[in-house]
Amino acid sequence: MKILVLGGAGYIGSHTVYRLIESGNEVVVFDNLETGHIEAVHPKAKFYKGDLRNRSEIDSVFEKEKGIDAVIHFAANSLVGESMTNPLKYYDNNLNGTEVLLQSMVAHGIDKIVFSSTAATYGEPERTPILETDPTNPTNCYGETKKSMERMFYWVEKAHGLRYVSLRYFNACGAHISGKIGEAHNPETHLIPIILQAAQGTRDHISIFGTDYPTSDGTCIRDYIHVTDLAQAHILAVEYLMKGGKSDIFNLGNGVGFSVREVIEKAKEVTQKDIKVVEESRRSGDPAVLIASSDKAKTVLGWKPEYDDLGTIIKTAWKWHSTHPNGYSK
């Protein structure tokens, strides 16, 4: 297959590109490098620097790269906090960018897309594990834009026959098993890399926000999914569409939750480092428990997480962070 990966220099995008190429596919990457890293792009991928909001730039890729079978769309801003203080940035980049992409896809006859969505579309869950049919009531602008992007695909399919798969995933984590690429955000907002930065000494401590939740140890419980397993799900979704599969939405998670304290303790075990912990008050909007039901993805796509053990997930992340303490920076 020949696949165009938008946002292919980012964390999940770059791992998906690696997985695609390791599976023998031809890959074209389009990224503006605002948050992505050129060093994360697989050397065998064809790279174009460009902004999705610029129609001529994405048109140019479709015109130069004949025979693209499908698009995988990761290109979006994704910081929850920033989305609340600068919502217009998220409407511009996430929604406007996707609108321009769809215009170009329709014009060039590209009719299959796999979309990187999020558990943030659900907001405060009514139950766990969360099913794809559960209500979507986002509690932040990031989740709202992702929900709106899903609706754009729905209506564009009705008008133009474009088929899509939307993958709503939970807490992405870990790194490529080789240690060549991994997670490098600035600022870092995800739990596991923050814990590992504290283990490295590049961060003074890890804060636990809330110790009085109705959970076994009082801290929030989340569903952690290895980035390589997410990458594999995107490939399976493309193959599903290539075989004529109908448009659909799938959750991606391990279906097992770990508390913040459990993740910290496992990181101490893996790294053999002392990690300073500071207990703080709850953050508003943090649900006590978020766990996905991924039964639908397993049944329909044939997806099965390969790295479903928390210790293994943290080991791959630690391999990356311990050899790249400054991420992709020299």
Label each residue range with its predicted role.
Residues 1-172:
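N-terminal Rossmann-like NAD(P)+-binding domain of SDR-like oxidoreductases, especially those catalyzing
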Residues 127, 138-145, 184-192, 223-227:
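The catalytic Tyr-centered alpha-helix of NAD(P)H-dependent dehydrogenases
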Residues 38, 170-191, 201-222:
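Short, flexible, glycine-rich and Lys/Arg-enriched loop motifs at helix boundaries
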